[in-house]
């Protein structure tokens, strides 16, 4: 027979998709530990404001630009401020979930890597929240910033004294920025499109929003980026192969001449 059957070989970089139920329980469990763990410093108001003053002074000592320069861009009209508040309130968590879901079904190897990196980043953030409670700049009188969510809406926070669903003194580091940066890095690593660097617009817009709405200091984002860098240095991304970074369009070489040579040789 001329037809040959060759066993298919598994791609060296291929990774089996983890069981879905286990992953759901793991991710939800880790998030709940973080969510409830950071509530432990919710009542540390005096310390949070002292740390806010320190961070503000550190930024001036480092000659970082004032957060007012970014906020002034959003205060040219009610619409822009409202859009920024909406982005802050609605994009952060759904974008990260969508990122993990897509990786789980399309790039299992990158999913495992991204989940580990995000878990490490979030765990390190929780430690910092507990060790360094920090009031956001919108609460710091010395900053002279507008609480855009309170003035223009929508707001995801209530008064700190009565808000039991969130810890508003967990500003350092900014997981809004840390997660957004990981989403961009993960999608760049997991895809092949020449347009994939555009994913960096997500953390760039997020940085503008969190600073412009006075929810975070520059240092909150800098520390988040540093923690993410450490996690990425320890947890390496999967090697890029056809199975880990998506199928690439391949050119098939014509086999007509080869078949002719085989047939001619067989008749001699």
Where are the language model's segments positioned?
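Hydrophobic, membrane-inserted alpha-helices
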Residues: 95-100, 178-185, 202-209
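Aromatic-anchored segments of alpha-helical transmembrane domains
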Residues: 32-36, 122-130, 201-214
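Short, conserved phosphate/pyrophosphate- and ester-handling motifs at nucleotide-, phospho-/glycolipid
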Residues: 92, 176, 220
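Interfacial helix-loop-helix junctions of multi-pass membrane proteins
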Residues: 134-143, 167-171, 205-231
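Membrane-interface loops
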Residues: 45-54, 104-194, 242-263
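N-terminal transmembrane-helix/juxtamembrane module of multi-pass inner/ER membrane proteins
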Residues: 2-94, 267-268
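C-terminal membrane module of polytopic membrane proteins
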Residues: 213-214, 219-268
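Residue-level signature of transmembrane alpha-helical entry/exit and packing/kink sites
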Residues: 19, 23, 27, 113-114, ...
